[in-house]
A protein has these predicted regions:
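Surface-exposed short loop/turn segments
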Residues: 25-42, 117-173
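C-terminal motif of bacterial Sec signal peptides marking the signal peptidase cleavage site
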Residues: 18-21
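Envelope-exposed proteins and targeting segments
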Residues: 58-63, 76-78, 86, 102, ...
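Bacterial N-terminal signal peptides that target proteins for export
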Residues: 2-12
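Sec-exported extracytoplasmic/periplasmic mature domains
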Residues: 111, 115-119, 149, 213-220
Length: 220
């Protein structure tokens, strides 16, 4: 009887210790929210047929290289700058990330924009054209130079995107530069946080893409 009396309080004490230990375990770290530029632009229209009703007119080809970026923009971190404190320092959000590096997201948008009026080729497709037809299409090379949420004050920020672009044409003597330009876009963020920065950077990227596509058409 005495042993039974001692055993029950001991079992209760052990159970209490276990419950206390479980309650003291750290919570699982919150998973970072992943973002991209949204579902994309409207699908490009089909090539228009000729006046005689024959097959649709073939779109001009353009080779789109991979978008380059400096080492600061190689990762998937969502970056911001405090312009009112130290604009030279890039800071990452802790719980907000891009689903892919910004250069890849930008290239997807650029390909969508160009495909409305061009047959867009990647590096491998361009190489195939060169082997089979003995020619290379004009080539567009883009470098992403700035991609951050820029805080002008604690409560006001913009999405800041800057790219440099070079359009070249392959010739027997080597590539000839047709045009070269830098594009910059700033779009206001609806909120002074990571999700607001995502919306602003997506809008600024779309603005840069629209301007770049129009420039390509004019330069050719």
């Amino acid at each position: 009887m005495t042993s039974m009396t001692l055993k029950n309080p001991l079992a209760g004490l052990l159970a209490a210790i276990c419950l206390a230990g479980c309650g003291a375990l750290p919570d699982k770290p919150a998973r970072a929210a992943l973002y991209d530029f949204g579902p994309g632009l409207a699908a490009p229209a089909a090539p228009a047929a000729s006046a005689t009703g024959s097959a649709p007119r073939a779109l001009p080809m353009i080779a789109l290289a991979e978008v380059d970026a400096n080492s600061r923009l190689d990762g998937t971190q969502l970056l911001y700058r405090l312009g009112y404190a130290d604009a030279n320092e890039l800071r990452p959000y802790g719980q907000s990330r891009w689903s892919q590096p910004p250069a890849q997201l930008l290239r997807q948008r650029l390909r969508e924009g160009l495909s409305a009026g061009h047959t867009v080729l990647g590096p491998e497709e361009s190489a195939t054209i060169a082997r089979t037809e003995g020619r290379l299409p004009d080539s567009l090379r883009v470098t992403l130079e700035e991609f951050s949420q820029y805080f002008e004050s604690p409560g006001r920020s913009v999405g800041l995107v800057r790219v440099s672009a070079t359009l070249t044409r392959n010739q027997p003597g080597g590539d000839r530069v047709l045009a070269q330009r830098t594009f910059t876009a700033r779009q206001p963020a609806p909120t002074a946080d990571g999700p607001g920065g995502v919306k602003a950077l997506a809008a600024a990227s779309d603005a840069v893409v629209a301007e770049l596509v129009a420039w390509v058409d004019q330069a050719r």
